[in-house]
Amino acid sequence: MTDMLGDWKRSHLCGTLTKADVGKQVTLMGWVMRRRDHGGLIFIDLRDREGLAQIVFDPAKAPEAHREAEAVRNEYVVAIKGEVVPRPEGTVNPNMKTGEVEILVTQCKLLNRSKALPFTLDDYVDVAENLRLKHRYLDLRRTPLQQNLILRSRVSQVTRQYLTENGFLEIETPFLTKSTPEGARDFLVPSRINQGNFYALPQSPQIFKQILMISGFDRYFQVVRCFRDEDLRADRQPEFTQIDCELSFVDRDDVIAVMEGLIARIFKEAKEIDVQLPIPRMTYAEAIRRYGVDNPDVRFGLELVELTDIVKGSGFKVFADVAAGGGIIKGLNAKGCARFSRKEIDDLTEFVKIYGAKGLAYVKIEGGEWHSPIAKFFTAQEIADMNRAFGAEEGDLLLFVADKPKVVNDSLGKLRNQLAQILGLVDKGTFKFVWITDFPLLEWDEEEKRWAAVHHPFTAPMDEDLDKVESDPGACRAKAYDLVLNGNEIGGGSIRIHQQHIQSLMFRMLGLSEEEARAKFGFLLDALEFGTPPHGGIAFGMDRLIMLLTGSDSIRDVIAFPKTQKGACLMSDAPSPVDSKQLRELAIKVTVKQ
């Protein structure tokens, strides 16, 4: 039998009691974390979201409560009444918030029992993640996950407070919207009333927040769910949360200034970390040149070295041919890594092949000389010039990739991060931000043989590049900006196109006919004709931001009910088949690919 709660009222949360509470009569309720029977006295660690309290059952003082405690097991739900007393000398636990006190029980109620657990609820559990996700209600009782979600809630509160103080209005935008397939696939929702037609779940509130600016609301924000039906990676979810903002009558610097204030407030109030403002900025071109990627981790050096001009006339045919064909040659100096074995270098070679590189040339600096199969192809002057470019010293390992610029930058940029992990160059306790600006407006899609928007079709070109949009699309820069933290893009935004003729031009550049643009975006094109203010905004990825703030290894550890990499919720068994009657009401017939 279990007891009913009756008229008992909780007086305190378990993890909040301190020496200041000694002598108080308290009522606590929670889960039994562990039970210890010391041959008379029974000790229970009682847990709630605030932490643990040590509960003492003394048969001499409360025999009935002691009998109840004898039957208690882990994860039973109990309520106790008792007095807060100091722990005996020598038993104080400095690792617990409540470690100086314990509660001497006078009464106890067993509110509910628990089955045997499929896994322990320790801070670190060595168990398959799928088992944890299947029993997510148990997994979420673990302290690390509870702390993650408590911090997430705090970040949401701080965000709303800061943005409201700065004149933003929280306005909801629709979840049932029009499908405008650009980029990732939409999640589609069939309409029962308008059979054969579908809503789409929003990939972002982009167009609606722009229309709110056209409507004169000046500053908008939303902590909003977004949906993308794409192949999932470890750091992606089909549904995710954005801190979404839009501002009228602003330029890039205005948006960045307000958003830096938000980031600084979040880090200060959530983690007691002071973010140095202003955050450094770097152009896209500089990021690619120095780091190979547009989301560089600037906590460490290991920058890419441009070598094309030095080696284009060399006797090493691989390098010379690549340079002659319009490719580039770049390298990395892995300081002190001449000790690497052939197998370790082979592993690095296989790693860069993942990103399209055909191979990885290497040189070891030993005894003041080059040791490498390629050393014989270079003159003494070329070797001296490369040593100077690399800053090469005794014991260094020089690594080279030669290919098309995108392949070279991608592969070396990823190799840079990999080497930083191997060599322990990353200080995991530091947070380093950088804004990336001046992105290309358009990029050529080789598969579809057309131009594609680097960010999205509503990003404005730089004023000075506007006359090149048609004549030289690849040279046009966008009024776009990303915020990168420790090598992770946590926010992206831009100044938007606010003139209809430029928006129509952008759609044409993306290969949309006037009819297609009207069919997909007609309501935006119409709105742009009615006095649209200059405006811009940004969206921060809440899930990734919380993952970095908490030092979590997986984005699934900062979401209450995440999906697997196959898009499934193992706890609720979604997605699942639906009743045939529901399908008939929607005029839908299901055909499953074999």
UniProtKB/Swiss-Prot annotation:
User: Which Pfam families does this UniProt record tie to the protein?
Assistant: GAD, tRNA-synt_2, tRNA_anti-codon
Quaternary structure?
Answer: Homodimer.
Gene of this entry:
aspS
What cystine linkages occur within this chain? Answer: none
Source species of the chain: Geobacter sulfurreducens (strain ATCC 51573 / DSM 12127 / PCA)
The GO terms describing molecular function are: aspartate-tRNA ligase activity; aspartate-tRNA(Asn) ligase activity; ATP binding; nucleic acid binding
Show the coiled coil region(s).
Answer: none
Name the SUPFAM superfamilies on file: Class II aaRS and biotin synthetases (SSF55681), GAD domain-like (SSF55261), Nucleic acid-binding proteins (SSF50249)
Enzyme category, top tier: ligase
Q: What does this protein do?
A: Aspartyl-tRNA synthetase with relaxed tRNA specificity since it is able to aspartylate not only its cognate tRNA(Asp) but also tRNA(Asn). Reaction proceeds in two steps: L-aspartate is first activated by ATP to form Asp-AMP and then transferred to the acceptor end of tRNA(Asp/Asn).
Q: Where does ATP bind?
A: 228-230, 237, 489, 541-544
What keyword terms does UniProt attach to this protein? Answer: Aminoacyl-tRNA synthetase, ATP-binding, Cytoplasm, Ligase, Nucleotide-binding, Protein biosynthesis
The cellular component terms of Gene Ontology attached to this UniProt record, alphabetical and capped at eight, are:
cytoplasm
Q: Quick one: where's region Aspartate? A: 206-209
Tell me its EC number(s), please.
Answer: 6.1.1.23
Q: What's the catalysed reaction?
A: tRNA(Asx) + L-aspartate + ATP = L-aspartyl-tRNA(Asx) + AMP + diphosphate
**Annotated positions binding L-aspartate:** 182, 228, 455, 496
Q: Output the lineage of the source organism.
A: Bacteria, Pseudomonadati, Thermodesulfobacteriota, Desulfuromonadia, Geobacterales
Q: What is this protein called?
A: Aspartate--tRNA(Asp/Asn) ligase
Biological process per Gene Ontology, one example term: aspartyl-tRNA aminoacylation
Localization, per the record, is: Cytoplasm
Q: Which domain of life is it from?
A: Bacteria
Where does this chain mainly localize? cytoplasm
Family of the protein in this entry = Belongs to the class-II aminoacyl-tRNA synthetase family. Type 1 subfamily.
Q: Where is this site: Important for tRNA non-discrimination?
A: 38, 90
